[in-house]
Amino acid sequence: MSGRRSRSRQSSGTSRISEDQINDLIIKLQQLLPELRDSRRSDKVSAARVLQDTCNYIRNLHREVDDLSERLSELLANSDTAQAALIRSLLTQ
């Protein structure tokens, strides 16, 4: 009983999200992940796996952005064309 009271006190000042809303968000995340998007609807994937795969996917995207930024910087540093100057100015804005 005290556990229920403490939970209700903790959430009284914040908006609550229903279990159905959480499940809908998990399904939406699953549809965004390439590895899980292709799994059949009948295949039940746990929410924990969806969240873990989402975190891994975001980390990989960050790494790709960092790598591409580095490659672009190297290409622009080695190029003295007007187009490269324009791209450099756009990137520093």
From Swiss-Prot:
It comes from Arabidopsis thaliana. Gene3D superfamilies: Helix-loop-helix DNA-binding domain. Keywords: Brassinosteroid signaling pathway, Cytoplasm, Gibberellin signaling pathway, Growth regulation, Nucleus, Transcription, Transcription regulation. It is found in: Nucleus; Cytoplasm. Induction: Not induced by exogenous gibberellin. Plants over-expressing PRE3 show long hypocotyls, pale green and slightly narrow leaves, elongated petioles and early flowering. They are not sensitive to the gibberellin inhibitor paclobutrazol during seed germination. The keyword Membrane does not apply. This is Transcription factor PRE3. GO terms for biological process: brassinosteroid mediated signaling pathway; embryonic root morphogenesis; gibberellic acid mediated signaling pathway; regulation of growth; root development. The lineage of its organism: Eukaryota, Viridiplantae, Streptophyta, Embryophyta, Tracheophyta. The keyword Nucleus applies. GO terms for cellular component: cytoplasm; nucleus. Expressed in root and shoot meristems, and young siliques. Low levels detected in all aerial tissues.
